[in-house]
């Protein structure tokens, strides 16, 4: 029988088909620890599930992982549901996860704690960014369910405490998948209106699932970026949501939020009355002090003898005028003297005088320079003539005119002794009117007169 060889692709696809048709492998529940976690830019998650003895590659596509509330991390123990298949390119089997829950802790509770830690590290809970709630808000925006008890409590409280306050309700969903986007859009709409002084965002109490919209990151960030101060009013006193931490002020209940948003009219009236009484008392005291001061002035010398006071002041004015005239004259005299001194100094140091003096000095120096140059020229001319005369006396040409000549060897070196040549050497004799080329045919050596 002839052997049939399979391709790697064919074998891999066969194994994949076997696995995918196995009902036990198409609905698998696993628990394990996450490692090598990677979050792809397209939203897919890739990681490894492991226990003490084995590991398996895991994939969770974006369509499934967008439904989980917490953030998977390396080292986290999880419970997953999925199916087993083969990744043909590597020939490895892996689990394709459809659902994932944290092992040992609630899904929502873990997501809550993770988001709380992350936003706190970013500074969204810092008191530095908290906006001040206006003390006398004219327009109060309320973002909540239009049918719940919360809106009734808020409106009743505001109308009772502050009847002149204008309430604008932004109806939203407060639970379910669409609740968070609904709340975010309401906050944006309120900010775009531009005439709202404070916002109340909240709902009545409930379970963590029912309150979850106020734990969503998008809601928290929208509250943080709101230009309008926000009071959170979610649940009851024991319920804390992420929105409570980010809001500018947290109220334990919707009723308490309304009380924090507006003042009490009765308390305001009492304050106005107290301030009116305090102002009246201050005015009476001020008038009394002014009356006492007026009485003192009326008893003063100026009020009793105004004519004498006028004459005294008139005399003082005359003396002051005389002193002013004298001071003016002294000042003018002083300035005239200063002007004369400056004029004399200017005339003495006028540039024209300096120019004349400098011009005279230059002319004197020019004449002196010409004399010295003439003297120097004559001296140099005399020295030159004497040197020329000496040079002429010592010139070899003068000696040659008396019958002498200069003898050179073949290398044009002057011969000074018969010892410098040999028989047959070619020599040149320079006379005053030309050169003789000669050959040495005999040498006769003579003694010098000095015996050398």
From Swiss-Prot:
One of its GO terms (cellular component) is exodeoxyribonuclease VII complex. It comes from the Bacteria. Its EC number is 3.1.11.6. Keywords: Cytoplasm, Exonuclease, Hydrolase, Nuclease. CDD domains: ExoVII_LU_OBF. Coiled coil: none annotated. GO terms for molecular function: exodeoxyribonuclease VII activity; nucleic acid binding. It is found in: Cytoplasm. InterPro entries: Exonuc_VII_L (IPR003753), Exonuc_VII_lsu_C (IPR020579), OB-fold_nuc-bd_dom (IPR025824). The keyword Nuclease applies. It catalyses: Exonucleolytic cleavage in either 5'- to 3'- or 3'- to 5'-direction to yield nucleoside 5'-phosphates. Disulfide bonds: none annotated. One of its GO terms (biological process) is DNA catabolic process. Belongs to the XseA family. Bidirectionally degrades single-stranded DNA into large acid-insoluble oligonucleotides, which are then degraded further into small acid-soluble oligonucleotides. Heterooligomer composed of large and small subunits. This is Exodeoxyribonuclease 7 large subunit. It comes from Bacillus mycoides (strain KBAB4). The gene is xseA.
